């Protein structure tokens, strides 16, 4: 018998398109590392790309983690949204 759960465990994506005055870059790097399992250098490089004006797309483990990352990045003054499939 299959047990159905309401949490989506399929991979999800987050698009980060920009930043606002007061952006907390170090905290954003840490949040991205935690959600995406990237290393420090990779996460730092992605944040630097956003700061330079290039949007990025991050792969995360599931929709819940993706939503948490979007919320965290918003608090850190980065513009992010879930990528719909």
Roles of regions detected by a PLM:
Residues 1-85:
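Short, amphipathic alpha-helical interaction segments embedded in low-complexity terminal/linker regions
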């Amino acid at each position: 018998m299959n047990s159905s759960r309401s949490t989506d465990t399929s991979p999800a994506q987050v698009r980060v398109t920009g930043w606002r005055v007061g952006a907390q870059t170090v905290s954003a790097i840490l949040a991205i590392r935690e959600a995406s399992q990237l290393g420090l250098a990779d996460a730092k490089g992605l944040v630097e790309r956003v700061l330079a004006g290039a949007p990025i797309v991050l792969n995360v483990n599931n929709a819940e983690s993706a939503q948490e990352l979007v919320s965290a990045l918003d608090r850190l003054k980065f513009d992010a949204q879930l990528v719909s499939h």
